[in-house]
From Swiss-Prot:
The protein's name in its UniProt record: 5'-nucleotidase SurE
Residues involved in a divalent metal cation binding: 13-14, 44, 101
Cofactor binding note of this UniProt entry: Binds 1 divalent metal cation per subunit.
Top EC category: hydrolase
tRNA processing keyword on record: no
Reaction(s) catalysed (UniProt annotation): a ribonucleoside 5'-phosphate + H2O = a ribonucleoside + phosphate
E.C. code: 3.1.3.5
Amino acid sequence: MKDEKPLILVTNDDGILAPGIRALISVMETIGDVVVVAPDKPQSAMGHAITINNTLFLDKISKDDDTITEYSCSGTPVDCVKLAVNEILKRKPDLCVSGINHGSNSSINVIYSGTMSAAVEAGIEGIQAIGFSLLDFDWNADFEPAKAFVKKITLETLKNKLPPGVVLNVNFPKLSEKEIKGIKVCRQAKAYYAQKFDKRQTPFGKDYYWLTGKFTNEDNGEDTDEWALENGYISVVPVQFDLTAHHTMQQLNTWKLNG
């Protein structure tokens, strides 16, 4: 009797029609049985938002005889994972992959990322999970160089298993496959956005704003994701969703909080 193929949930934040998710699907179908649940429109920078004050709609867009089952969802990337795990799939998936995102999710971007939040939500559900991103915002970005590395990282994750509470944040430099120097396990670089708002007015005199800003990296450590990407490597950062600052607990216990 042949081993059962792994069940793989695929999602993203750029929307179900984005080239990045199509590239990811093409890799995953060589590994296991694939179910896709992704937003029906772009949901970038949604973070871990969920829909609680509006209805959620789910539409099956694949045909019954298609080899891959696909659904589009009116909600956020995290909504997609929640619906997939609790309403669509008959069993818990062996893996959830999110992406391939059009644009970086390295460093501080991981906090804002809908791509990574979908992976984190899967991790919360006890599912092995990986978020993939390419440092190219272009809708016509070339995902071919990333595919072999996506497959390798996916197979290693399925084989070795991540510890509970940990998911992977994988970012690819915008390089050809030959130019990529390899894969580096990294820590998240310390960076921030210098925020700026472009203030404008409607024809009726009402102010409105466009958020802009400049990404600023304050961390030149050679063990960081930003260094790896700038130097031609794929960055792999293990991300945890226990946000407790454990190293600060002892200090807080010296405060006179109860007296």
